[in-house]
Swiss-Prot record:
NCBIfam families: S18 (TIGR00165). GO terms for molecular function: small ribosomal subunit rRNA binding; structural constituent of ribosome. Keywords: Ribonucleoprotein, Ribosomal protein, RNA-binding, rRNA-binding. This is Small ribosomal subunit protein bS18. Coiled coil: none annotated. HAMAP family: Ribosomal_bS18. The keyword Ribosomal protein applies.
Length: 78
């Protein structure tokens, strides 16, 4: 007899960018960008954050710009 998995379907995560009707992800909006980076400073993948592919590209570019401008760290401080 095959094993049955516990639990049901997981609820789909809401795209934070689309839900708030944000057209342009500003690299200066550090509070918004912190939702999309880990505690180690890495960009979180789509499956974790729930963003669409288009918005994930916007977020990734904004995070990279903010890192270059010195607004976000490249690596986390231990």
């Amino acid at each position: 007899m095959p094993q049955q998995r516990k639990g049901g379907r997981r609820r789909r995560k809401v795209d934070l960018i689309a839900a708030n009707h944000i057209d342009y992800v500003d690299y200066k909006d550090v509070d918004l960008l912190k939702h999309f980076i880990s505690e180690r400073g890495k960009i979180l993948p789509r499956r974790v954050t729930g963003t669409s592919a288009k918005n994930q590209r916007k977020v990734a570019n904004a995070i990279k710009r903010a890192r270059i401008m010195g607004l976000l760290p490249f690596v986390a401080e231990d």
